């Protein structure tokens, strides 16, 4: 990214589950807003994803421990409202 200090302009909460919400849930579990912030902080160009589903497979937290995720959905319906959606 050209601008390494991208800040979100607005935030909203997820209302229903989707594949995008699933991936945001995984990034936020690992301590990041979204894929943009993860790539900025970890200085990586690609995120490990499951080829079958496209969901995030593995993330490295800020303390350098790893989170590993399943191929299937992990964000239950009761967790969806906790997911934050950032607009840039």
Swiss-Prot record:
The keyword Ligase does not apply. One of its GO terms (cellular component) is nucleus. One of its GO terms (biological process) is cell differentiation. Belongs to the MEIG1 family. Interacts with PACRG. InterPro entries: Meiosis-expressed_gene_1. Keywords: Differentiation, Spermatogenesis. Essential for spermiogenesis. It comes from the Eukaryota. This is Meiosis expressed gene 1 protein homolog. Pfam families: Meiosis_expr.
């Amino acid at each position: 990214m050209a601008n390494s200090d991208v800040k979100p302009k607005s935030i909203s909460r997820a209302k229903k589950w989707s594949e995008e919400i699933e991936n945001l849930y995984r990034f936020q579990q690992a301590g990041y807003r979204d894929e943009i912030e993860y790539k900025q902080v970890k200085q990586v160009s690609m995120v490990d994803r499951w080829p079958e589903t496209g969901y995030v497979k593995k993330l490295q937290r800020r303390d350098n421990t790893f989170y590993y995720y399943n191929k299937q959905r992990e964000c239950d319906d009761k967790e969806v409202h906790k997911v934050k959606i950032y607009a840039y």
